[in-house]
Design a protein with these regions (language model features):
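Positively charged n-region of N-terminal signal peptides that target proteins for export
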Residues: 1-5
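Active-site metal-binding motif and surrounding structural segment of the metallo-beta-lactamase
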Residues: 71-133, 224-226
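Core dinuclear metal-dependent hydrolase active-site scaffold
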Residues: 24-93, 159-221, 305-311
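Cap/insert and terminal regions of metallo-dependent hydrolase folds
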Residues: 196-201, 208-306
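Short internal beta-strands
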Residues: 105, 130-139, 229, 272-274
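A short, active-site helix/loop in glycosyltransferases that binds the activated sugar's phosphate group
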Residues: 137-147
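A short helix-to-beta-strand connector/capping loop
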Residues: 26, 128, 152-158, 171-174, ...
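Bacterial N-terminal signal peptides
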Residues: 6-19
Length: 311
């Protein structure tokens, strides 16, 4: 009953946004706000050359993976993941597009993807009923564990339950479907999000264990969307000496390149690697591995790049 009443109250809320907006200049779009793995780049404790330049020059840092759906006409945006860099990511959107936070979709309960919601609490923003969209285990985790449950109790956030594979109409121009994937689900399940706007469609999937561990083919989602932002955490298994890579499984870039080598060029061009670990050579603009990925017809997500709307 709690799920139902919460969902009904949110459905009443979204009808406030059911007007029609005409004109390309008013078209909503998706923007990349971060491309790094949970710890960002540079990452805490890193003294290696991969982080050295970023420590010396903050302009070279990469925020944690996050995308936003921006509606410039209605002056609203929705975040996909709440990262440690959420204050900077929110400030960027506010200054550049004069838009306000309308909701957050959380993929899972790993530190880089949900802990940013702490900034909505009374110690910081003190927001009122910001919609936060989650799958069932994530819902349970947030309402039963502090400090997150305080955000719910004080009504800083309003948890909106989602069901995997069931599209949720956020407004008449914007639909989101949670797609559950296999990952290290210690505290919650893990989701990717399928976004459908009135002009373009997108798939945001920053974390998955391995493509072959999923009972679905990722290629089907690439085919049915215009842009896919996919897990590119590690380039190869040798990237972090001394770490057991089986404890932190992700599809290596080299595995993805091999899997997709025979895809049509138009399909390859939809793929944008995101969620890059600070050690990933794809973060280095002149690295030959980065050039090889681009030469293969695939892309590497870039902070500040917008997709759809008026380019």
């Amino acid at each position: 009953m709690r799920y139902l009443s919460t969902l009904l109250s949110y459905l009443a809320f979204i009808f406030l946004f059911s007007d029609n907006i005409l004109g390309q200049e008013n078209s909503p779009f998706l923007i990349v706000l971060g491309i790094a793995q949970d710890g960002g780049s540079p990452q805490a404790g890193c003294k290696k050359s991969c982080c050295e330049k970023s420590w010396l020059d903050s302009r070279k840092k990469n925020y944690v993976s996050c995308v936003a759906w921006v509606d410039p006409a209605r002056k609203k945006y929705w975040l996909f993941d709440a990262t440690k860099d959420m204050p900077e990511q929110m400030h960027y959107l506010s200054k550049k597009y004069d838009v306000a936070l309308a909701g957050i979709f959380l993929t899972h309960a790993h530190v880089g993807h949900y802990t940013g919601i702490i900034h909505l609490g009374r110690e910081v923003m003190g927001t009122k009923n910001i919609p936060v969209f989650v799958l069932p285990r994530m819902y349970k985790y947030l309402v039963e564990n502090g400090p997150w449950k305080q955000l719910v109790e004080l009504k800083n956030i309003q948890l909106i339950p989602m069901e995997a594979d069931i599209p949720m109409q956020i407004a008449d121009w914007f639909e989101v479907t949670a797609i559950q994937v296999p990952h290290r689900d210690e505290f919650s399940e893990t989701a990717g999000f399928l976004l459908r706007g009135d002009q373009k469609s997108y798939f945001y999937l920053p974390d998955i264990d391995k493509w072959e561990k999923w009972d679905r083919a990722i290629e089907n989602y690439i085919k049915e969307t215009d842009y896919s932002f996919l897990d590119g955490t590690f380039y190869n298994p040798l990237e972090i000496p001394g770490r057991n890579m089986f404890e932190i499984p992700h599809p290596f870039i080299v595995e993805s390149l091999e899997r997709w080598k025979n895809l049509p060029e138009v399909e390859k061009n939809k793929i944008h690697f995101i969620h890059l670990n600070h050690t990933n050579p794809l973060l280095q603009k002149r690295h030959p591995y980065r050039k090889s990925v681009l030469s293969a017809g695939l892309n590497i997500a870039k902070m500040g790049t917008m997709y759809g709307g008026k380019q």
